[in-house]
Amino acid sequence: MAKEHIVLFPFMSQGHIIPFLSLAKLISERHPTYTITLLNTPLNILNLQSTLPPNSNIHLKSLPYRSSDFGLPPDRENTDSLPFPLVLSFYQSGESLATHFTHFVSDLTRQNHDTPPLLIVADVFFGWTAEIAKRLNTHVSFSTCGAYGTAAYFSVWLHLPHAETDLPDFTAPGFPETFKLQRNQLSTYLKKADGSDRWSKFFQRQISLSLTSDAMICNTVEEMEAEGLRLLRKNTGLRVWSIGPLLPSLPPNSSLGRSGRKSGMEVSYIMKWLDSHPPGSVVYVSFGSIHDTAAQMTSLAVGLAVELATRSCGHSGRRFGGNRNRNSNPNGVPDEFEARMRGSGRGILIHGWAPQLEILEHESTGAFVSHCGWNSTLESLSRGVCMIGWPLAAEQFYNSKMVEEDWEWGGTCEGSGGGVRSEEVERLVRLVTEDEKGSDEENEQYDEMIGGYEEKGGEGSLSGQLIKFIGMESQ
């Protein structure tokens, strides 16, 4: 007898793998008789093995991949270990998985009494999967970003409206005239895009193919992004399901990160350090694993150092807890800054992965300086920690714009992406921590939208949305 099977295929990046893994676990809980297979490259699958309990109905399957075939360093299968100049080649290498993906789906169908998977849910960065999966009438795209950010990202890459004007701001097609984007907020490669460059060709192809899907999943909450979801549905013409927040969960005192990565510093030491500081006094800083530059990190360090130096060491003093990916530019954060923080006891710098959820949940954490990746944005909101946005690339600028202007949950560093002055960092740390952006009432509102959404019952809950999605899209 054929078994119901759902295939999940995230792009090879932690920001994509984490919500896909959360989705797999949610489906597993709600549909324990289903088999769920999560596909990826060998090293990513190896890292994920520790995240699943024994006898799980979630299977991990690796597809052959050799990074050196694409001019990349050996054993580089994730953006977290990649210098930025190689990122586009890495993105493009994903399409080499097409043959292996086709063979996997064909073998799975044959082994399951010629019954194809109930659903194939693939990353929007793997838009090419639509051509293969739709032969079986079973393809759904998954945007691991929010609805607002996804809609803006799609519009800007598909139409390149900034290339048609010299003005400092512009409107994205499909958005109201009042919706303005700033040219200086765009990443360097997007500013230069003209439709014939490699970046444009990659994103326009993957987005266009994703739009041929039967439907799309978005990692968001209907009540939180009603307008963003309306725009995304209108602009794509797809059924868009808000299945979120897909937030990771960790067992207490775990030393492993959200996708099987070990913390760069003992979690117990970090928690002890946080315990030693007053509530709301710590500024947590963490960016994504790519895009950071030495100049940006120096501005950050100087700005934080000035803010720390102008405060007493008493209750009002700010503390710094930072995370620097071990593969980032080793000259990014000045050595003297790290030494000063360590010597004064007012700061720690974590090299490698940080236990972000535990840090954000701790009462000592009062602000979060972030690149505004969507996972970090959801985690910050759900833990009631205001954000200082330092967007660097992708849809991060649109997320930061929404955090500041729509939700009033923090501020954005002026000049993000193209360089930020240290004075701007100092100003925003003071703004968020002294003015206490994010009242108790707002905290409760976002906790209800995000933190409490999964606990609700009924159709509006996360589980309810998932049941409706699987029921409709598998018909």
UniProtKB/Swiss-Prot annotation:
Substrates-to-products reaction catalysed: crocetin + UDP-alpha-D-glucose = beta-D-glucosyl crocetin + UDP; beta-D-glucosyl crocetin + UDP-alpha-D-glucose = bis(beta-D-glucosyl) crocetin + UDP; beta-D-gentiobiosyl crocetin + UDP-alpha-D-glucose = beta-D-gentiobiosyl beta-D-glucosyl crocetin + UDP
Claim: Lipoprotein is one of the keywords in the record: no
GO MF annotations, alphabetized: UDP-glucosyltransferase activity
Record-listed an anthocyanidin binding positions: H16, A394
Binding residues annotated for UDP-alpha-D-glucose, in chain numbering: T144, A354, Q356, H371, W374, N375, S376, E379, E395, Q396
Superkingdom assignment: Eukaryota
Keyword flag Glycosyltransferase: yes
EC class: transferase
Family per record: Belongs to the UDP-glycosyltransferase family.
Name of the protein in its database record: Crocetin glucosyltransferase 3
Lineage: Eukaryota, Viridiplantae, Streptophyta, Embryophyta, Tracheophyta
Gene: GLT3
